């Protein structure tokens, strides 16, 4: 191993989102994992974090990831099984609302990223995270601003996290009808705010968020009950 490790990475022109990953693989730092989260700003439902390792070669079947910022729901659903099929490894972690309340969003997010990387069946040589540094990883890592539009492995992780969470929120609507979880996915919208005012928060809401906390302080009734209709394993981890 050279005295200076990891070695300086030289970026050369490559195809689509693979430039950064290709440079890391060329310098012997693969496999490269991307990690991203969904649900950070929602006031209900879990925080979902995914880690994904793609191979060093560009796959035509995943070419749509080059434009991940513009992906609609149908395209994400189409890519979801393709990513799971061709990824060298992936792992999805679900952090429930009560843990988000207890830890705080940022700390829960960092912990989720650590768990997602630790759960990979292939140990990465390097980790690319979307937006901010993930301390405590046992391998080199790099935060990438706008990572889901800059690195294919982060874009793939973003799709895995988004589809997994959206499906869970649809199931949550069946358990807690009236809130519109299937539509707004737990984010604050006028319809969600109106439902909260009428029904009060349920067990899936984040009581540390001010719009929910205000209702609790005002004495709005709370609806208990947990999610029961999710796919097996979706309340914890998938990988």
Swiss-Prot record:
Primary gene name: rnhB
Subcellular location field: Cytoplasm
One cellular component (GO) term of this entry: cytoplasm
Chain segments annotated as coiled-coil in the UniProt record: none
Family: Belongs to the RNase HII family.
Reactions mediated catalytically: Endonucleolytic cleavage to 5'-phosphomonoester
Origin species: Mycobacterium sp. (strain KMS)
EC number annotated for this UniProt entry: 3.1.26.4
GO molecular function terms noted in the UniProt entry: manganese ion binding; RNA binding; RNA-DNA hybrid ribonuclease activity
This protein's name: Ribonuclease HII
Membrane-spanning intervals of the chain: none
Gene3D superfamilies: Ribonuclease H-like superfamily/Ribonuclease H
GO biological process: DNA replication, removal of RNA primer; mismatch repair
Main location: cytoplasm
Keywords of the record: Cytoplasm, Endonuclease, Hydrolase, Manganese, Metal-binding, Nuclease
Cofactor: binding comment: Manganese or magnesium. Binds 1 divalent metal ion per monomer in the absence of substrate. May bind a second metal ion after substrate binding.
InterPro entries assigned: RNase_HII (IPR022898), RNase_HII/HIII (IPR001352), RNase_HII/HIII_dom (IPR024567), RNaseH-like_sf (IPR012337), RNaseH_sf (IPR036397)
Role according to the record: Endonuclease that specifically degrades the RNA of RNA-DNA hybrids.
Domain RNase H type-2, chain residue ranges per copy: 30-221
Ligand binding (a divalent metal cation): 36-37, 130
Keyword set includes Ribosomal protein: no
NCBIfam families per the UniProt record, alphabetical: PRK00015.1-3, PRK00015.2-2, PRK00015.2-4
């Amino acid at each position: 191993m050279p005295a200076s490790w990891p070695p300086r990475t030289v970026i050369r022109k490559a195809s689509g989102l693979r430039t950064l990953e290709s440079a890391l693989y060329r310098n012997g730092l693969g496999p490269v994992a991307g990690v991203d989260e969904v649900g950070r700003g929602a006031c209900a439902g879990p925080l979902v974090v995914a880690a994904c390792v793609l191979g060093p070669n560009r796959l035509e079947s995943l070419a749509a990831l080059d434009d991940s910022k513009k992906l609609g729901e149908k395209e994400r659903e189409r890519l979801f099984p393709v990513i799971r099929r061709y990824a060298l490894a992936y792992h999805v972690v679900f952090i429930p609302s009560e843990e988000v309340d207890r830890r705080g969003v940022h700390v829960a997010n960092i912990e989720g990223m650590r768990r997602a990387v630790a759960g990979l069946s292939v140990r990465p040589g390097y980790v690319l995270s979307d937006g901010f540094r993930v301390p405590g990883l046992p391998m080199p890592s790099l935060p990438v601003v706008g990572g889901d539009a800059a690195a294919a492995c982060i874009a793939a992780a973003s799709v895995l996290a988004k589809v997994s969470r959206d499906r869970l929120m649809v199931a949550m609507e069946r358990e807690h009808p009236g809130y519109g979880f299937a539509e707004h996915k737990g984010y604050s919208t006028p319809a969600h705010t109106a439902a909260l005012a009428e029904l009060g928060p349920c067990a899936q809401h984040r009581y540390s968020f001010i719009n929910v906390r205000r209702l609790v302080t005002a004495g709005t009734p709370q609806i208990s009950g947990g999610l029961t209709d999710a796919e097996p394993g979706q309340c914890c981890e998938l990988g």
